A protein has these predicted regions:
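Class II aminoacyl-tRNA synthetase catalytic cores and aaRS-like
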Residues: 1-590
Length: 590
């Protein structure tokens, strides 16, 4: 760089700086030789500034400018002037830099794809050349904004008496939850660490260590099959508080959301958020993370069909089941029979045996079931669903009300997405509360903790933890935004006797509980304050704030569907000596 040192960033200059001498540096986004005058767009982490080389430019500098190509790295000095032909395509479109000194710091080969936002690029190619993809403004900005979001989070917690504490990332593997990533110990042959799925146990022990309020922006790892919104390694905004109630935790976190949305998006979020019990969320929306930006709410029409002679419904009701419905109001012209058949496939994917329908059009009603109903049943159904000409009624029956509602909930979402019922500019927050404490695993043949084994049961359910696990609810809460679970938490058990009962309800022997969680159980013996906390997926939070379609867009180097990282080639085979040092022998399946 010689004696040149940056004095300004490209994206931060304006008309207020016109007439100033300055030095800027970055990469050439593109260069255009107009014959006697050369324009070049210089890009740095803040934005783009147009460089100008003309007849007044020193000859040696102009000669260098003639060699400029895309992605050459340069530093240059010159005078900032007001542009004659202004543009609103870039933030600095009112000014340009007339260059008097230029140094080419690094040349560049032709890139495998153009680094412009308007160019569609194959995802595999983008991930292979992630460092190039991140130079594009639309891919660069989310990482910068993510950093600002993290700064606000840290500032907010520090302002509210939290202490930032780092917990270990080489920990003991414990049961429950997803599969652990394991790390072999070289110094203790045959022993393994696990990478943390969350700092859960350590943050609870911090409360038992006298730290009143803790937070951490933590790296976490889960060896599970990937979905669109999941990564094997992810970042979690983690928090825990002592001497608080569920209400206190919600208030603190509503304040965090309020500050983030105001400082990042200049949006005033209204608090407190709606609190919706889990049973209500499932019953009305068919989801424990309901999207409340649109209607199409699920209705319970079981009473309408009491005594029905329509055999499919009658059989379900005889078995103690339920019939649920939604009214796709005014969509009869858009939901053809073919469309409804596709919705039926959606319902079946989520466990429904079928999707009954009625299309109410000006030409009459077409239905898969109405001819089997009495006039009284039809009238009662129409009244219950406020049905009128132009509507489509969709019904699911099942012996399991959760399954029926879940299937209709997915149908509801499919209709809304395909028919423009969702306002993309809305941010609808709510709390889902009073989750079931347990869920039964047919595969395991036992009750499992819906969240984790340390979740506090509701006071009215304490006597039922072992005798009737399915009837127990938890002091647990999820914060939901636009149909996405952004974070969740609970109050924790701080009574050793209750924790022992919880372990027994989950099928743990005393020996197994002590083997897995003995260090936590020992800590409880020395006095444990009431405590609770929350955790957010930072990647998902940033994705929602910036309205991105995938968390890959807000992670610098994301993994793909097979948990690989295309740019570096991870994971990879390792040297035989490394395996020998770790006392590991491989037995690979063909």
């Amino acid at each position: 760089m010689g004696n040149l040192r940056r004095t300004n960033y490209c994206g931060e200059v304006s008309l207020a700086n016109a007439g100033q001498e300055m030095t800027v540096c970055g990469s050439i986004a593109r260069a255009r030789d107009k014959g006697g005058i050369i324009f070049a767009d210089l890009r740095d982490t803040t934005g783009i500034l147009q460089l100008v080389f003309d007849e007044d430019t020193p000859k040696d500098v102009f000669a260098k400018a003639e060699s400029l190509k895309s992605e050459y790295v340069v530093i240059c000095r010159g005078k900032l002037r007001e542009r004659a032909a202004k543009t609103d395509k870039i933030a600095t479109g009112d000014v340009e830099l007339y260059v008097s000194e230029l140094r080419i710091l690094s040349e560049a080969q032709t890139t495998p794809f153009e680094l412009r936002d308007e160019i569609n690029v194959n995802d595999d190619l983008r991930l292979r050349y992630r460092y190039l993809d991140r130079r594009r403004p639309s891919m660069h900005a989310p990482i910068v904004l993510r950093s600002k979001i993290m700064q606000i989070i840290r500032s907010y917690f520090c302002d509210n008496h939290f202490t930032e504490i780092e917990t270990p990332t080489l920990i003991k593997s414990t049961p429950e939850g997803a599969r652990d990533y394991l790390v072999p110990s070289r110094v203790q042959p045959g022993h393994f660490y696990a990478l943390p799925q969350s700092p859960q146990l350590y943050k609870q022990i911090l409360m038992l260590s006298g730290f009143d309020r803790y937070f951490q922006i933590a790296r976490c790892y889960r060896d599970e099959d990937l979905r669109a919104d999941r990564q094997p390694e992810f970042t979690q905004v983690d928090e825990e508080m002592s001497f608080v109630s569920e209400d206190d935790i919600m208030t603190i976190n509503e304040g965090l959301i309020k500050r983030l949305w105001k400082e990042m998006l200049n949006i005033d979020v209204q608090t407190p958020f709606v609190r919706m019990p889990w049973d209500e969320a499932m019953g009305r929306f068919g989801s424990d993370k309901p999207d409340t930006r649109f209607g199409l709410e699920i209705q319970n029409v079981t009473e309408v069909f009491k005594g029905t002679e329509f055999k499919p419904f009658a059989a379900v009701l005889e078995a103690g089941g339920t019939i649920r419905a939604i009214n796709a109001k005014g969509l009869a012209d858009k939901l053809s029979r073919k469309n409804i058949d596709k919705l039926g496939e959606v319902a079946k994917t989520y466990g429904a045996k079928g999707l009954a329908y009625s299309r109410l059009t000006a030409d009459g009603t077409s239905s898969s079931f109405e001819k089997f109903l009495s006039d009284a049943e039809k009238a009662a159904l129409y009244a219950a669903l406020n049905a009128e000409t132009g509507d489509v009624l969709l019904l699911v029956s099942d012996t399991d009300w959760v399954k029926a509602c879940t299937a209709l909930g997915q149908v509801r979402l499919d209709i809304a997405r395909k028919h423009g019922l969702i306002d993309p500019d809305k941010f609808n927050f709510l709390w889902v509360v009073d989750f079931p404490l347990f869920e039964y695993s047919e595969q395991e043949g036992r009750w499992m903790a819906m969240h984790h084994p340390f979740t506090l049961p509701k006071a009215e359910d304490l006597d039922k933890v072992e005798s009737d696990p399915g009837a127990c609810h938890a002091v647990a809460y999820d914060i939901v935004l636009n149909g996405v679970e952004m974070g969740g938490g609970s109050m924790r058990i701080n009574d050793p006797a209750l924790q022992d009962r919880m372990f027994r309800a989950l099928g743990f022997t005393e020996e197994k509980a002590r083997e897995s969680f003995g260090f936590l159980m020992d800590a409880y013996k020395f006095g444990a304050p009431p405590h609770g906390g929350m955790a957010y997926g930072l990647d998902r939070m940033v994705m929602l704030m910036l309205k991105k379609d995938s968390i890959r867009d807000v992670i610098a180097f994301p993994k793909v569907q097979n948990a690989g990282e295309p740019m570096s080639g991870a994971p990879d085979v390792v040297d035989a000596q490394q395996l020998k040092d770790l006392n590991i022998a491989l037995t690979l399946k063909d």
